[in-house]
């Protein structure tokens, strides 16, 4: 045995709490305390193994240093394939690192000495769930799961294939959880905590298998960590700090019956870390000895607070070697090399030690094939030797579930083969990939960057060059470092992690190109421009009328209604979602130009440029301040004005100037004083909205059909003493026109109908081809706002009453419903009006609330509240897999577009108990389903229903899941008195159930899957 303490491996005198050797043996990582943050350092293994490499100045010792953790790093662990490095620290975070293929070294940021990062490692995922310090992390044998434990008494199982998805949160410990280890077979995971217990959990259903407490009854919480370990053959689990007759031991727990009859004794203080050698050994055969095969055995290293290290062989009753006073402080972590002959040990004193054994001392290691045969003969097929495509966390009990998984695997294989073919085709055209980036050589890129630097001359003739930051170039791949003197086994390749995107709406000016910001939790945001489609809306799309306020004193105040839709923010933080926008820039002529000129001076009007823009249903960021009222306080109803333009003959310009027009609304009388209000309630006055001022002529662009224009010309001619007004419609080059006997105040249209509101409270309705559908409708009060969607007409009168009709069916949907109910506060305004394609009116208020009117119940229902704590605290990201991230642009998405990221932000900023987060998430998802049902948005209903079901499965809410399945299945046998409806908004419930069943069968609810699958087969 050789012992080495490389002094160059240090954290500048600060403690080192963790060490781990890379699976290929070329490097190792340390984690601990930095100067003012946590520190993760990746070191070269070659100078540790060979003295000549240590003396060679051309071989770097430090490869990379990462100071991203805000507090001390307690654990670092490499994934079994060597692609990822996970680190957990006191900042409650787990960071997952991956090597980046940047060209050239870089200096360590903030370093006083000129430290150089030879390799570049970037954080690809930040895992947030723990509410306390993260003490330990561990990768599963097949790298599909990552487990973390914390002082918050929980163990979190992360889906390593789809970070940051949480598969399970293991609760049961009543003390700080300080250690984790996976069963090498993949059936169990064990955790040890300060509550004097060691718990073993099943990976099949993430439930508790057993809790062992007797060996720990005399233990106290005196150790910083409790790093337990499982033997590579799976037979034994060895704990950290245990007691036997008041003496510190490492308890040996047998897998068969979880018996605790043996332990490792001899240390004078508490055992902090136990680490099994990854190899299984057999006795080395000497020359001339019997060829009889020996019984395999394992090797284990034990570290203690007494600063000593002991190495044990399970075939011996006494330790193979004991090294006393190896460090000045407690041993914190141990890591074996993959060949099983080397061991790295770190201490709280900030140093590490390396022990190099020979095969004569430990024995002959078994090959991986022999090791796998032991696993298969003892336990069946081991998860450690299964590929990800073969990975199955549960035993498949149903052949239908097996067929479904096989179909999924086949589809994934086909997609993979297609991508490989595309990549190979591209590779043939670019043989020099390593030296080319985006079609340019790296040398050309560097030269072009240097040309951009700014050089000036001072008065005395000296040159002054402004520094230019040149970002490092990522070639997309990296080769083996030249200084690695150890052969690397295999190619360490991994797919780039999908970035989690948060979408944020930018400026909403009609002439500015809109963009969505996409950001990763651990990266700076990047912009991605989105082009609108020509489609008016998707299946359940809406036409939106944004509302602004101003006094109607000027004759130039013309009510207009351009329709814009704000894209919904991403449901799942991982993907950029693009929303279909309805283009609807209305154009209206204005006979008085003074208002426009005044607005120009205030920089409130900008020219529309011929660019692709993403329009929004929300208000513009720049608004005209309402004129100060001369009487009682006013309640303002913000209405989206339709844009104004000078009348010109022929087809109007598309690059019209948008003019927001403000309208005042008479508010109820001022409230009585608090003294009088105690006994007298002042009667509320009726709301009063302004009437559109008649204009000589104006032009509108129909929001749902950008190729459709309405031209109005009032009092164009006089016939028989009466003045006639003309309505002209132009759609894709086809025109029709008609005349009316009254002046037209406002107009609206859709793909099916055209509607105009005239003086004398008359409403006229025409077909899309100009045929009058109804005699003039006489309204109770004058019109204030008019809107059309499909065959539906919505009117808002000056008395603040709302009405909706279906022209084709000639039925009333909403009859003179007052807005008094939802305009609760004196400062509340209506910021947006929506009319869905199902005739559901929606009012978005300035206080962040949105209401829709339910014709069946004749009630206003709250469908969205931007201040709702449920929306801010719900966290359902783990329930949405990456391949199912979908675009949702229905009415609910439009209403909630501004706040879709609030829950994600709150989850990062504020910690809460997991049980409370479960309850808030369930309540939020159920509210979303109910709101989508109220808005008759079928695709949004299906979207949220799938998310809800997946969340129930992930969290194990069987009773709610069963209730959901029962409602979708309905009665198995026909009953004449049954009230069950087989469809919901045109969606067949049993078809929805078929979509949910594969999600249910992926977890511990296979029997529930079988139960409902059989009933569906019968039906």
From Swiss-Prot:
Residue span of region Interaction with RBBP4: 23-443
Transmembrane in keyword set: no
GO BP term, pick one: DNA-templated transcription
Effect of residue 996 to A: Abrogates interaction with HDAC2
Per-repeat ranges for WD: 11-53, 68-107, 129-168, 172-211, 220-263, 266-322, 326-367
Gene3D superfamilies (UniProt xref): YVTN repeat-like/Quinoprotein amine dehydrogenase
Keyword terms, alphabetized: Chromatin regulator, Nucleus, Repeat, Repressor, Transcription, Transcription regulation, WD repeat
Any Gene Ontology CC annotation: HIR complex
Location of the region described as Interaction with HDAC1 in the Swiss-Prot/TrEMBL record: 444-1019
Effect in UniProt of substituting residue 993 to A: Abrogates interaction with HDAC2 and impairs transcriptional repression
Region (Disordered): 406-433, 513-561, 599-633
Subcellular location: Nucleus
UniProt feature, compositional bias: Low complexity: 406-415, 544-561
Keyword Disulfide bond on entry: no
Signal peptide: none
UniProt similarity note: Belongs to the WD repeat HIR1 family.
The protein's role, per its UniProt record: Cooperates with ASF1A to promote replication-independent chromatin assembly. May regulate the transcription of a variety of genes controlling cell growth.
Quaternary state and interactors: Interacts with ASF1, HDAC1, HDAC2 and RBBP4.
UniProt protein name: Protein HIRA
Encoding gene (name): HIRA
């Amino acid at each position: 045995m050789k012992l080495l303490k490389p002094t160059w491996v240090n954290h500048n005198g600060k403690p080192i709490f963790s060490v781990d050797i890379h699976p290929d043996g070329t490097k190792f990582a340390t984690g601990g305390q930095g100067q003012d943050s946590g520190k993760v350092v990746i070191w070269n293994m070659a100078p540790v193994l060979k003295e000549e490499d240590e003396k060679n100045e051309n071989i770097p010792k430090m490869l990379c240093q990462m100071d991203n953790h805000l507090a001390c790093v307690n654990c670092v662990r490499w994934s079994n394939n060597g692609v990822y490095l996970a680190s957990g620290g006191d900042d409650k975070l787990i960071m997952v690192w991956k090597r980046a293929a940047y060209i050239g070294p870089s200096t360590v940021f903030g370093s006083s000495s000129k430290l150089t990062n030879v390799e570049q490692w970037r954080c690809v995922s930040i895992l947030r769930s723990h509410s306390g310090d993260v003490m330990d992390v561990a990768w599963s044998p097949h790298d599909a799961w990552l487990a973390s434990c914390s002082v918050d008494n929980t163990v979190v199982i992360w889906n390593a294939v789809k970070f940051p998805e949480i598969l399970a949160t293991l609760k049961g410990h009543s003390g700080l959880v300080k250690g984790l280890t996976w069963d090498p077979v993949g059936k169990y995971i064990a955790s040890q905590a300060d509550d004097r217990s060691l718990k073993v959990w099943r990976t099949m259903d993430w439930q508790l298998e057993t809790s062992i407490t007797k060996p720990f009854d005399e233990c106290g919480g005196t150790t910083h960590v409790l790093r337990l370990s499982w033997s590579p053959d799976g037979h034994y689990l060895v704990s950290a700090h245990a007691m036997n007759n008041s003496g510190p031991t490492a308890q040996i727990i047998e897998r068969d019956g979880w018996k605790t009859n043996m332990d490792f004794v001899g240390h004078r203080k508490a055992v902090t870390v136990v680490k099994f050698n990854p190899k299984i050994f057999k006795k080395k055969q000497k020359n001339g000895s019997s060829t009889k095969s020996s019984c395999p055995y394992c090797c284990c290293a034990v570290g203690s607070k007494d600063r000593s290290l002991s190495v044990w062989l399970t075939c011996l009753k006494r330790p193979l070697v004991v090294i006393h006073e190896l460090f000045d402080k407690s041993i914190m972590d141990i890591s074996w090399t993959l060949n099983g002959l080397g061991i790295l040990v770190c201490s709280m004193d900030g140093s590490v030690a390396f022990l190099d054994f020979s095969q004569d001392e430990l024995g002959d290691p078994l090959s991986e094939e022999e090791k796998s045969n032991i696993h298969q003969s003892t336990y069946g097929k081991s998860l450690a030797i299964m590929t990800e495509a073969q990975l199955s966390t549960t035993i498949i009990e149903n052949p239908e579930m097996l067929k479904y998984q096989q179909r999924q695997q086949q589809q994934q294989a086909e997609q993979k083969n297609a991508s490989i073919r595309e990549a190979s085709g591209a590779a043939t055209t670019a043989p020099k990939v390593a030296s080319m980036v985006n079609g340019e050589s790296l040398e050309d890129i560097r030269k072009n960057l240097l040309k951009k630097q700014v050089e000036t001359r001072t008065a005395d003739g000296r040159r002054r060059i402004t520094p230019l930051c040149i970002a490092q170039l990522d070639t997309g791949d990296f080769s083996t470092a030249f200084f690695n003197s150890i052969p690397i086994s295999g190619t360490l390749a991994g797919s780039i992690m999908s970035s989690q995107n948060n979408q944020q709406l930018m400026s909403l000016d009609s002439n500015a190109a809109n963009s969505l910001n996409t950001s990763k939790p651990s990266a700076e945001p990047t912009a991605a421009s989105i082009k609108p489609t020509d489609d008016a809306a998707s299946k359940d799309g809406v036409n939106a009328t944004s509302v602004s306020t101003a006094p109607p004193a000027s004759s130039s105040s013309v009510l207009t209604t351009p329709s814009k839709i704000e894209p919904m923010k991403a449901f799942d933080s991982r993907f950029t979602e693009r929303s279909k926008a309805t283009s609807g820039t209305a154009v209206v002529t204005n006979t008085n130009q003074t208002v426009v000129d005044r607005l120009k001076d205030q920089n409130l009007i900008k020219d529309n440029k011929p660019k692709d823009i993403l329009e929004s249903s929300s208000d513009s960021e720049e608004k005209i301040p309402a004129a100060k009222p001369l009487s009682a306080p006013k309640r303002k109803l913000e209405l989206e004005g339709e844009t104004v333009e000078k009348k010109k003959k022929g087809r109007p310009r598309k690059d019209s100037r948008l003019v927001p027009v403000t309208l005042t609304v008479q508010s109820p009388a001022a409230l009585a004083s608090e003294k009088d209000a105690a006994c007298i309630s002042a009667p509320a006055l009726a709301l009063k909205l302004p009437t559109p001022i008649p204009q000589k002529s104006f032009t509108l662009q129909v929001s749902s059909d950008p190729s459709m224009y309405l031209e109005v010309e009032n009092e164009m001619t006089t016939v028989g003493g009466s003045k006639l007004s003309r309505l002209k419609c132009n759609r894709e080059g086809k025109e029709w026109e008609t005349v009316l006997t009254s002046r037209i105040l406002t107009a609206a249209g859709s793909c099916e109908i055209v509607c105009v509101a005239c003086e004398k409270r008359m409403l006229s309705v025409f077909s899309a081809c100009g045929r009058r559908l109804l005699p003039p409708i006489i309204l109770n009060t004058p019109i204030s706002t008019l809107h059309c969607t499909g065959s539906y007409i919505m009117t808002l009168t000056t008395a603040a009453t709302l009405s909706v009709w279906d022209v084709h069916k000639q039925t009333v949907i909403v009859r003179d419903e007052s807005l008094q109910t939802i305009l609760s506060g004196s400062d509340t305004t209506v910021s947006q009006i929506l009319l869905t394609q199902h005739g559901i009116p929606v009012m978005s208020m300035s206080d962040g609330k949105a209401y829709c009117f339910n014709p069946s119940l004749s009630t206003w229902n709250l469908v969205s509240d931007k201040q709702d704590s449920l929306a801010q605290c719900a966290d359902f990201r783990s329930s949405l897999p990456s391949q199912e991230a979908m675009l949702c642009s229905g009415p609910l998405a439009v209403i909630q577009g501004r706040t879709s990221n609030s829950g994600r932000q709150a989850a990062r900023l504020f910690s809460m108990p997991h049980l409370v987060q479960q309850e808030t998430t369930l309540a939020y998802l159920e509210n979303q389903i109910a709101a989508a049902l109220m808005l008759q948005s079928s695709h949004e209903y299906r979207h949220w229903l799938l998310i809800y079901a997946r969340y129930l499965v992930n969290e194990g809410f069987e009773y709610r899941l069963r209730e959901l399945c029962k409602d979708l299945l309905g009665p198995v046998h026909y009953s004449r008195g049954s009230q069950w409806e087989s469809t919901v908004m045109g969606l067949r419930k049993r078809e929805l159930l078929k979509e949910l069943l594969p999600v249910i069968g992926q977890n511990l609810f296979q029997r529930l899957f079988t139960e409902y699958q059989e009933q569906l087969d019968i039906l």
